[in-house]
Amino acid sequence: MEYLIGIQGPDYVLVASDRVAASNIVQMKDDHDKMFKMSEKILLLCVGEAGDTVQFAEYIQKNVQLYKMRNGYELSPTAAANFTRRNLADYLRSRTPYHVNLLLAGYDEHEGPALYYMDYLAALAKAPFAAHGYGAFLTLSILDRYYTPTISREKAVELLRKCLEELQKRFILNLPTFSVRIIDRNGIHDLDNISFPKQGS
């Protein structure tokens, strides 16, 4: 039902998510933000069960911020991804597992940009591009065909738009609006939302 996508460039990570909050087959709102700011240069994108997403993402968010307050410096994207994975794995083995799928995007002065893919079974992988949701089946082949490690920001936005247009054409569900953000050495920046007219209007 939901869709997340991330594209890593040479000095940035571009991410996008749909804005639909749904309950079963009913759309509850169309301006829901599925991105959570972990720190100045780390963003967590989270989809899954409605209650689990917010509860788990905010739990990780507060712990990452607590780490900075205690130690005086922020976690790197790699450290934040491994911390998130460990918590998700621990909850998976408890009576209250979280059913969430995640993308973690960030920038580190030493490691550069990083994009991590994590599923509800706590499998973690560093990837040059990633997507979650049914839409991933339709768009991963496009990313595989057109992605290059040196892709410019303009070309990455074009590639993102190409993926979202494919969703509008082939995905049976209506995902009309997408939040877009970019993470680089200067932090997290909002880009213009990408919107599509509703089918048949």
From Swiss-Prot:
Its main location: cytoplasm. It is found in: Cytoplasm; Nucleus. GO terms for cellular component: cytosol; nucleoplasm; nucleus; proteasome core complex; proteasome core complex, beta-subunit complex. SUPFAM superfamilies: N-terminal nucleophile aminohydrolases (Ntn hydrolases). Belongs to the peptidase T1B family. PANTHER family: METALLOPROTEASE TLDD, PROTEASOME SUBUNIT BETA TYPE-1. This is Proteasome subunit beta type-2. It comes from Bos taurus (Bovine).
